[in-house]
Amino acid sequence: KASHQVELYDEELNCEPYKKIGIKTLKPFKINKNIKKALSKMSKVNQEILDKKLFPMTFGGEHSITPGCIVPFTKKYKDICLLHFDAHADLRESYNGEKFSHASAIKRCLDYPNVSLISFGIRNISKSEIPFLKKNSSRIKIFWAKDKMKWDLNKFKKLIKNKKVYLTFDV
């Protein structure tokens, strides 16, 4: 496991944080190959964790799981900022006929009106995503990869102020 190769000591905090806050890894559970059922399962698992007043962290290979994972947060919090790190916008309505594709995962998250989006590092966007991006410019801010030397991090801080932030990384 990759997590076994990480040092547990944090030099900034001068401690091993897991000893103070605790970390629990769930036992692996079966995920259905049907994407809608899989997303429903992820939503249910995260809801159970939130109901226990714990903080869930979910890991997948890319953003396909995010629309399911974020559902309990959309119910619990009135204003959520989805902080998205990726090379692609993932704002398509569907991809190859699949509404819940990796290429439309972030769009599915924005189906919830209380979710806003900040994307960092986008270098690719399809023509079909542009109208949605323009129509929702009040909810979406993209920090383009080509402009990284000009990113205004103070603007970023203002965008997330007083919001609950949900992080998603495409790896």
Q: In which residue ranges do the predicted regions lie?
A:
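Conserved alpha-helical scaffold segments that buttress catalytic/binding sites
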Residues: 1-171
